């Protein structure tokens, strides 16, 4: 019986263990995780804070006992500190007793995920996975200075937003999806909200100005303060009781009773040796093939937030830390270990969506700005259209954008915004088109249906494609 060691038991690790042990009983599995719980859906933190999710326990979909019943040996509060590929063993520290031991493997699965990038009070951006422990409520033990990832963070934020009457103002550092969702949650809890980011626009890494301008307008209309293009210099801390009081920026001090850091994530791979022929990309994630094997290491699989997977849009290895990528990568790795070569994760394109302040947004592939930075000869096509024929009497506005290579007509990216009716699932088939390296001429002739209850003969996707190809007479009059 082969022995598999799994490092990390959140989305990717749980998916791997469930798949492996439901398909085969020929493996012994030892799985280690630093946390005390598994499978927490961090996407629900903002929903729990705002009161949409009533019970945070509902944000778990598995637990250690379930995996044990499947046959896995689960070790919570255990930290893997080193890997030795020659001896095929890992070094593990029991965080409860502080004792260290080694464990042998035939195959190794690295599913250690990613940890929030946090700035300390001296403004040094560091990558220390235990900068604040899983049992700690606050970053660096500074009260009301918090990050956002775990169940423990969710409980702290719920207490801060919904129970602590002294917290009236919230500053959020970072305007990515987590930062924006928490900004909306704070606003729904009647807090004064300031969002700070070095980017020029909120969600600027995922969307171009045609979409971020609209998001910015809605947020400002609702009374949120946006400090874009703003650099954080440090945090204002009351030294007498070690409580955060605000954020120091290059545009002045932002006073706040609670400060949330949502700068982003960095793969938790510091324990992976740099001298054993792993291929890392710039942020420390590890390159893998279509079966999630680490390049150069057939018995080591890397899944989830610490894997660098081939991006079909950029044609580069990229680390895109999404739960969808995590669970798929776990499934593929498990099937390959069992012996299947048919299930492959050949590429990703970063498909994502956001519902915030009444807006429905979705995107995949490259933004216009990123495509230009990568050196593509970029073409764009943007269309504002109604989703149904006007003769239906009721219809909603949709904005759709395609980014493509003018030389080859290859589709590089897409972005979508709707104000009322949600059309975000359209992005799925654009993601597939990018993964399959489709051209505009092919996308424009996809066999789609027409039914006036739902769409137009030339729906907003086809209209955008046709505009890019020069068929402007198909474009709705503005």
UniProtKB/Swiss-Prot annotation:
Its cofactor is FAD. FAD binds at residues 8-12, 33, 43, 80, 111-114, 149, 177, 295-305, 322-324, 450. GO terms for molecular function: NADH dehydrogenase (ubiquinone) activity. Binds 1 FAD per subunit. It comes from the Bacteria. Its EC number is 1.6.3.4. The modification Cysteine sulfinic acid (-SO2H) is found at residue 43. The keyword Magnesium does not apply. It is an enzyme of class 1 (oxidoreductase). The active site is at 11 (proton acceptor), 43 (redox-active). Keywords: FAD, Flavoprotein, NAD, Oxidation, Oxidoreductase, Redox-active center. The keyword Oxidoreductase applies. Belongs to the class-III pyridine nucleotide-disulfide oxidoreductase family. Catalyzes the four-electron reduction of molecular oxygen to water. This is NADH oxidase. It comes from Mycoplasma genitalium (strain ATCC 33530 / DSM 19775 / NCTC 10195 / G37) (Mycoplasmoides genitalium).
């Amino acid at each position: 019986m082969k022995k598999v060691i799994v490092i990390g038991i959140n989305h990717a690790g749980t998916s791997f263990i469930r798949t492996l042990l439901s398909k085969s009983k020929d493996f012994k599995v030892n799985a280690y995780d630093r946390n005390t719980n598994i499978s927490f859906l961090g996407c629900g933190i903002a929903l729990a804070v705002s009161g949409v999710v009533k019970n945070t326990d509902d944000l778990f979909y598995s637990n250690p006992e379930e995996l044990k019943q499947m046959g896995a040996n689960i070790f919570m509060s255990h930290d893997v500190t080193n890997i030795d590929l020659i001896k095929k063993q890992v070094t593990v520290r029991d965080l409860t007793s502080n004792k260290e031991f080694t464990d042998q493997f035939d195959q190794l699965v690295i599913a250690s995920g990613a940890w929030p990038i946090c700035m300390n009070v001296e403004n040094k951006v560091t990558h220390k996975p235990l900068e604040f422990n899983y049992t700690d409520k606050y970053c660096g033990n500074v009260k009301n200075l918090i990050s956002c990832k775990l169940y423990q963070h969710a409980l702290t934020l719920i207490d801060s937003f919904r129970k602590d009457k002294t917290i009236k103002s919230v500053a959020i550092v970072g305007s990515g999806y987590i930062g924006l969702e928490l900004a909306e949650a704070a606003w729904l809890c009647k807090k004064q909200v300031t969002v700070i980011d070095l980017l020029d626009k909120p969600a600027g890494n995922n969307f171009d100005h045609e979409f971020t301008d609209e998001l910015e307008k809605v947020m400002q209309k609702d009374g949120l303060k946006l400090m874009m293009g703003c650099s954080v210099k440090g945090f204002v801390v009351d030294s007498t009781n070690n409580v955060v009081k605000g954020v120091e920026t290059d545009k002045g001090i932002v006073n706040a009773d609670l400060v949330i850091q949502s700068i982003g994530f960095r793969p938790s791979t510091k324990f992976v040796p740099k001298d054993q022929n792993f291929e890392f990309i710039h942020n420390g994630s590890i390159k893998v093939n279509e079966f999630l094997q680490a390049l150069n290491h057939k018995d080591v699989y890397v899944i989830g937030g610490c894997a660098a997977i081939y991006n079909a849009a950029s044609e580069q290895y990229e680390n895109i830390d999404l739960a969808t990528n995590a669970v798929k990568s776990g499934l593929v790795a498990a099937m390959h270990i069992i012996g299947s070569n048919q299930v492959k994760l050949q590429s990703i394109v970063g498909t994502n969506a956001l519902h915030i302040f009444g807006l429905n947004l979705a995107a995949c592939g490259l933004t216009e700005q990123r495509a230009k930075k990568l050196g593509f000869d970029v073409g764009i096509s943007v269309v504002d259209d109604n989703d149904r024929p006007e003769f239906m009497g009721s219809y909603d506005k949709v904005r759709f954008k395609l980014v493509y290579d003018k030389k080859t007509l290859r589709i590089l990216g897409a972005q979508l915004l709707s104000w009322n009716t949600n059309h975000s699932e359209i992005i799925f088939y654009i993601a597939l088109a990018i993964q399959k390296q489709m051209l505009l001429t092919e996308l424009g002739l996809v066999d789609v249906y027409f039914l006036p209850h739902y769409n137009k003969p030339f729906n907003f996707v086809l209209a955008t494609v046709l505009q890019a190809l020069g068929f402007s007479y198909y474009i709705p009059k503005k």
